[in-house]
Amino acid sequence: MKIGILCAIPKEIHFFELLPNSGQRVGGRTFFKSKHSFHELIIVECGIGKVNSAMVSTILIQEFKCEMLIFSGIAGGIDPDMEIGEVLIGEFLIQYDYGALKDGNIRVYRAGEIPMGIQKNKAEFVLDSVIKEKINTSLPDVRMGTILTGDVFLQCQETRKELYEKFGAQAVEMEGGAIAQIAEQFGIPAIVVRCLSDLAGANGHKLSSTSLKKAAKSSFETVQSILNALL
């Protein structure tokens, strides 16, 4: 299978093996070829945010003919029951900053729908059921849950609490929901793997270089296990 692997920042892509002289520049990004058993991989640092990740996802599908997308990276935890270093796979992905703003509150719609009137569909993009079963079988200890995506780096305890109360989500980040949206539009599956590097502003905790590196490595290792499960 040909799989596109996305990371947002250098520390996230650092652990992946990139074949020498395999880089190809498209749209201001360098796409590297690699292999994992029978899988052909296209690995790329997409950049931060929904626009970057959506653009690169489209290139992976259209230009490189990828049949699946996997994101590997870090996230901020918003579930009080989760701790730094825990890995989460996105079963549900919601773009929490997409919708209609009224009286200071945002009514979240499914990204891409006209944010007016009755919501036609649920806001979340859902992990493919067959892939979910394979991951659960091979990685029974890895948690699945809801990941929120927005174009904001969250370091605010009050907002963290509000997002958890509103969505019951486990983590917040800046790319996953957009990748899931693009993958769905092209009819291919997407898997978003995140390891908690910080707690999104809880108790004054700040993101450190050490926790970022450890989280990026844990996410990478989980992706390797997922690739094995997909053989």
Question: Residues of each region from the PLM?
Answer:
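Proline-aspartate-enriched helix->loop->beta-strand connector
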Residues: 66-70
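Generic non-transmembrane alpha-helical segments
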Residues: 130-141, 182, 221-229
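His/Asp/Glu-rich mid-to-C-terminal helical/loop segments that flank catalytic regions of hydrolases
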Residues: 200-231
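A C-terminal functional module that forms or caps the active site or interfaces directly
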Residues: 153-205
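Active-site-proximal beta-strand elements of phosphoester/diester hydrolases
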Residues: 41-46, 146-148, 193
